[in-house]
Swiss-Prot record:
Any one GO CC term of the record: nucleus
Chief subcellular location: nucleus
DNA-binding region per UniProt: 90-146, 182-239
One GO BP annotation of this record: regulation of seed development
Cited InterPro entries: AP2/ERF_dom, AP2/ERF_dom_sf, DNA-bd_dom_sf
Quaternary data: May form homodimer.
Protein's recorded name: APETALA2-like protein 4
Gene responsible for this protein: AP2-4
Transmembrane segments: none
Length: 438
């Protein structure tokens, strides 16, 4: 057996057996004559020098491992404040929607997400995002492709504002136009005309706008409906500057929620206290003061009625405030009874009723003469003393006012002398006159 050392960096061990010695090769006591042993075994104990490494050829396995490591190694990403990219797309600002089957592009501007349109491919959506990013944030914005690809687009986008350029990008998308027309919201009808309709309005699937002879007219009808619905944010077929009238009308409608005032103010006794104004389909509580002729009764000086608000000029003279729409709402039976007592209590009877009736039937100054400037129909009318149709008039007035007839009849009879007493007074007066003459 002999041992041999080779080189500085390695140790070589050589074993040699003489073929003449039979049975000398045994393993655990068993013969191993057919076992073939290697002549030299080499083991590396120290690293190789640069010169020795250059001589040793690289194995195939090592080359494959190096190539795979280089392929999977990614350059360090630049830290930005734009947020992570979408999981469904490798491009920035692009998202795939399975419901629509399109690639949609969005960009954030001033804390709001702006929709740029839907596209068939992710590359088209990414280019739309790049153009919007350059327009909103300048040439230093983070984009998906190189800046040299948008040299011509940069020259064109300088002529548009942000809103106008967003409209241009949206019109380039495939989701902008559906149907047989090149305009949004326009479809060729089977009758040969162009049908205009707008979708997703007021919770409905679409709203029919009509049939038009030309495609341009239908497109303009859609634009007007979109502006009326969404205002300046509407997606239109043509430039929104051509619809200035619709935009002004839309801004005017948004400012129509104004405070209304009735302005029912007169003298000291007729000053009306107007509460908070309300729309025409609601009722407003109006409190007014009664005139002097009605203050003689024991009723309260203030009455409260319900009337619809209406714009009317102030009354110059003192008196009860009676709005034109007041006759549509009948008062309660208690208020009617009190008003009948006021008219009937005039001292001598006839003169008091006549004065109250004249005051009541006097036209109200400052109101229109269209039939609403007179007193309400439930007020009492003047009656001649001794008239026989008083009960019939009371019944008719009670029936028209909507409250029980017995209350008006009772109030009138209690404050008015009967016909028998009137006839007895006349006979006694005539007898006294005859005696005096004699």
């Amino acid at each position: 057996m002999a041992a041999t050392f080779y080189g500085v960096g390695s140790i070589a061990l050589a074993m040699h057996e003489d073929d003449e010695e039979e049975g000398s090769g045994r393993v655990f006591g068993f013969a191993a004559g057919d076992l073939v042993r290697p002549a030299v075994v080499t083991q590396q104990l120290f690293p190789m020098t640069a010169a020795a490494a250059a001589v040793v050829p690289e194995s195939t396995e090592q080359r494959h491992v190096a190539a795979a490591a280089e392929q999977w190694a990614r350059p360090p990403s630049r830290k930005t404040r734009r947020g992570p990219r979408s999981r469904s797309s490798q491009y920035r600002g692009v998202t795939f929607y399975r419901r629509t089957g399109r690639w949609e592009s969005h960009i954030w501007d001033c804390g709001k997400q702006v929709y740029l349109g839907g596209f068939d491919t992710a590359q088209a959506a990414a280019r739309a995002y790049d153009q919007a990013a350059i327009k909103f944030r300048g040439v230093e914005a983070d984009i998906n492709f190189t800046l040299d690809d948008y040299k011509e687009d940069i020259k064109k986008m300088n002529n548009f504002s942000k809103e106008e350029f967003v409209q241009v990008l949206r019109r380039q998308g495939v989701g902008f136009v559906r149907g047989s027309s090149r305009f949004r919201g326009v479809t060729l009808h089977k009758c040969g005309k162009w049908e205009a309709r707008i979708g997703q309005l007021m919770g409905k699937k679409y709203v029919y706008l009509g049939l038009y002879d030309t495609e341009m007219e239908a497109a303009k009808a859609y634009d007007k409906a979109a502006i009326k619905c969404c205002g300046k944010e509407a997606v239109t077929n043509f430039d929104t500057q051509s619809y200035e009238d619709e935009l002004n009308l839309q801004s005017w409608d948004s400012e129509l929620d104004l405070e209304l005032s009735l302005g029912c103010s007169g003298g000291e006794r007729a000053a009306g206290e107007v509460l908070h104004s309300a729309p025409s389909n609601q009722r407003t509580s109006l409190t007014f003061m009664l005139p002097e002729e009605e203050e003689m009764t024991a009723c309260h000086r203030q009455r409260s009625i319900w009337a619809r608000p209406s714009l009317a000029p102030a009354m110059p003279d003192g008196g009860a405030v009676i709005c034109p729409d007041q006759h549509q709402h009948h008062p309660s039976s208690r208020n009617m009874l009190l008003m009948s007592q006021v008219i009937s209590s005039g001292g001598g009877g006839g003169s008091g009723r006549q004065g109250a009736a004249e005051l009541h039937m006097r036209p109200r100054h400052g109101w229109s003469s269209g039939g609403n400037n007179w007193a309400p129909p439930y007020a009492a009318r003047p009656r001649l003393p001794g008239a026989e149709d008083d009960d019939d008039d009371d019944s008719a007035a009670a029936a028209s006012s909507g409250f029980p007839m017995g209350q008006v009849a009772t109030a009138s009879s209690s404050s008015r002398p009967s016909s028998s007493s009137c006839s007895s007074r006349r006979s006694s007066t005539a007898a006294a006159t005859a005696t005096t003459g004699r």
